[in-house]
């Protein structure tokens, strides 16, 4: 088994997926790092959501086994939580596809990389509409519960990832469906967070009334 470290990046250069070599402070790696960070935060959201809703206490190994079998559906969870976890896992897979597209600059190699489609964007819009059911009348402050708070971290990280991606468009062409998907993600996490908070929200006016 090869070692995890290669020492090839000790002088500030590293490889993209297509084999091209660039400086580590390249905008490419800002985008890839933001996507990676976002996926990690989504993973934490999945773990919190699972821990908050699991009905039967199992060993950690059994929990992991149950979580990944049957299309990520677990017999320990209610249908609503299973649905939410499945949505989040789908988004993580799409982020991997997006990262692969960004990391392949060579046009001759892009055909082998999974593409995001217009249907992927529409599916994300359907999920936004699914959870955006209570009209919003004023600005909100995060922190109703753990899942809500973690979801807002996902929201703010997705916005940063989108900003980085638009900076990348100054150097290379980025697929329009990827840009649309990244734009929708922050909206999804906002509507999703409101559902996770059971629409019990901390409004700015509530804080002002206290002070």
Give the residues covered by each predicted segment.
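Phosphate/pyrophosphate-binding loop motifs in nucleotide- or prenyl diphosphate-using proteins
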Residues: 1-211
């Amino acid at each position: 088994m090869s070692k995890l470290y290669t020492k090839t990046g000790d002088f500030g250069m590293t490889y993209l997926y297509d084999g091209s070599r660039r400086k580590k402070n390249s905008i490419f790696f800002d985008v890839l790092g933001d996507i990676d960070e976002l996926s990690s935060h989504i993973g934490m959201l999945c773990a919190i959501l699972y821990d908050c809703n699991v009905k039967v206490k199992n060993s950690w190994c059994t929990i992991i086994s149950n979580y990944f079998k049957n299309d990520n559906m677990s017999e320990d969870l209610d249908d609503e939580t299973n649905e939410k976890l499945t949505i989040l896992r789908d988004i993580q897979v799409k982020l991997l596809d997006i990262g692969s597209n960004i990391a392949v600059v060579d046009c001759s190699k892009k055909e082998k990389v999974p593409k995001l489609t217009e249907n992927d964007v529409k599916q994300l819009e359907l999920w936004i509409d699914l959870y955006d059911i209570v009209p919003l009348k004023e600005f909100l402050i995060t922190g109703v519960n753990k899942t809500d708070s973690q979801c807002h971290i996902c929201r703010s990280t997705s916005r940063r990832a989108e900003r980085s991606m638009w900076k990348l468009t100054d150097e290379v062409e980025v697929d329009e469906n990827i840009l649309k998907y990244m734009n929708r993600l922050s909206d999804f996490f906002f509507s999703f967070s409101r559902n996770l908070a059971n629409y019990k929200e901390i409004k700015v006016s509530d804080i002002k009334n206290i002070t």
